[in-house]
Amino acid sequence: MPPKSRLSRIRNIGIIAHIDAGKTTVSERILYYTGKSYKIGEVHDGEAVMDWMPQEQERGITISSAVTTCNWANHEIHIIDTPGHVDFTIEVERSLRVLDGAVVVFDAVAGVEPQSETVWHQADKYGVPKIAFINKMDRVGADYFRVVKMMKERFASVPLPIQIPLGQQDQFLGVVDLIREKVVTWDDGSKGVNYQYSEIPGDREADAKANREIMLEILAEVDDGIAEKYLEGEEISESDLLRAIREATLANRLVPVMCGSALKNKGIQPVLDAVVNFLPSPEDVPPVRGIHPATKEELSRASSVKEPLSALAFKVMQDEGRKLTYIRIYSGQMKAGEELYNAGKKKKEKASRLLKMHANKRERLEQAGAGDIVAVMGLKETVTGDTICDEKNPILLESMEFYEPVISQAIEAKTPADQEKLSLALLKLMEEDPTLRVKYDEETAQTVISGMGELHLEVVIDRLGREFNAHVNVGKPRVVHRETIRNKVDVEGHFERELGDKKHFGHVRLVLEPKERGSGVEIEWKADTAILPAEYVKAVEEGIQESLVSGAVAGYPVVDIRIKILEVGLKEGESSPIGYKIAASSAFRDGCIKGESVLLQPIMAVNVITPAEFMGDVIGDINARKGEIQTITPKGAMCEIRALVPLKALFGYSTDLRSATQGRAVFTMQFYAYDQG
């Protein structure tokens, strides 16, 4: 058998989950057992290596994706630890775009939680193969098989339990490996470093045999080789099983399921084995696709150092005042000190240093190639979503989609000295975070920051003071609205004026129609653009686009509208781009007024998990907030309530929910749609 290539021995994986499922603890154990960390960091002590921002250590949650590299079984594993809090969904989205595989962590007590579903569907969107780890098997209420059942009900991929627990809750001792037909137990004295495989005890044999049969039946449905041997009653070897599980996992037909307790140091090494055995190397994923920046011809790049360079910038961070750009290299190579080409901006930039990251520590590299995830210093122009490539063989990869902010807050510098720092700090934070928006309100002389939720803005404000020494006074959070129209209208805009010594003319007729909620904006030319000079066409579109952004009535962006450009009148010697831009803008504003402009507010999908005894209080509170209950699902002693609630009614909800349920309920929310309140 030929030796494996370096690429085939790389794994780019993410660790993703709902908040508090224990994924940072899983990451810490992985670093410890692979020798990258000499001391186990605990989240509850604020010592987790991967959670290196002060805000993360105080809150015990992960905010920005930390990247680290470790080695296991002669394979190089690049791990991105991602946040589970919905306010930081963008971090998960960015990570999944550049990963090849994911470890999804579930809480054995809570099961499939709302954010677990969100991240799972995000992974599906990018076709990322997954393995599942059911964590916290030592906790009271842990139920492995219930979580597997929930996965089956909620997700399209079929869960394949390749382990079952040896005991549960305070009786959790280890796992039964259904592939090897052995029990795996861990030595507490060595903090789980030492573990052993042994024969299955007699009282667990029947249970193990029955679950292995289920595993074989599931595999037989997706793999002909296994089906043939299974039906013939032939023995199925360990290598047969590993091959079949790998192929089905890579095809996203199955998700291998494992279990353990990261906090109690049980179950992590088999997860590392599964990462190596079942998740893809860069060679296993399809070639990355893009277009030629000039000709728009479709192109692809295979994962090979022999191909021309193609890479995607997926994250920007400030590190001690210097900009670090995280890059996934899909093909080719890059060297420290060489010039790189930004295909979208058509600019060359020098990569002064290449770094391999370990959370917030680093190792300098001379070069990096296909399959690597590295941090680059020296890229001043490059931002998240930009393509880096070979200038002679350019390719533009698909950029990244970002969510629109739903909440805003006014801030003002405490002193004139803070004001100078504030402007620079916000520019740097916006570079890092594409979901953070900043604008200056001329009327109130306040800076308004907008983001994905209260926690998101809290962290931004905290970082302004802590990292940039820019201290601010904070206003109350405000909801970001949108506008649309109720009725179809036919309107005209006319502009005719002498400015200086030149006459300017423009005449535009538009039809505005309301569209379905969430369907966006559509601009359609009905007038014949072939007879119009290109600068007039551009001016009409600019007039409409600018009015869409600045709003027609209340100053909010206009959404869910179809704009048909029916006529563009010409006047020889007087027609001008200024005239058409103003006429189009005037027609659009007039149309919004006549079409009965209405305000839309963000509606959030809220999921509350509460003890059943507080269900009535929680539902009553949601109704009082003008929420609409979608489903109520009993979950043992708990109950899951899903509802749609206007964001403006949710400020301070976490405090109210805590006091109504004695701190025993948890909730998540994420943007659902803009609609009338």
UniProtKB/Swiss-Prot annotation:
GO molecular function, one term: GTPase activity
SMART domains: EFG_C, EFG_IV
Domain tr-type G: 8-283
GO BP: ribosome disassembly
InterPro entries: EFG_II, EFG_III, EFG_III/V, EFG_V, EFG_V-like, EFTu-like_2, G_TR_CS, P-loop_NTPase
GO cellular component entries: cytoplasm
Cell compartments where the protein resides: Cytoplasm
Pfam family, one: GTP_EFTU
Keywords: Cytoplasm, Elongation factor, GTP-binding, Nucleotide-binding, Protein biosynthesis
Homology family: Belongs to the TRAFAC class translation factor GTPase superfamily. Classic translation factor GTPase family. EF-G/EF-2 subfamily.
NCBIfam families named in the record: EF-G, PRK12740.1-5, small_GTP
PANTHER family assigned: RIBOSOME-RELEASING FACTOR 2, MITOCHONDRIAL, TRANSLATION ELONGATION FACTOR G-RELATED
Protein name as catalogued: Elongation factor G 2
Organism: Syntrophus aciditrophicus (strain SB)
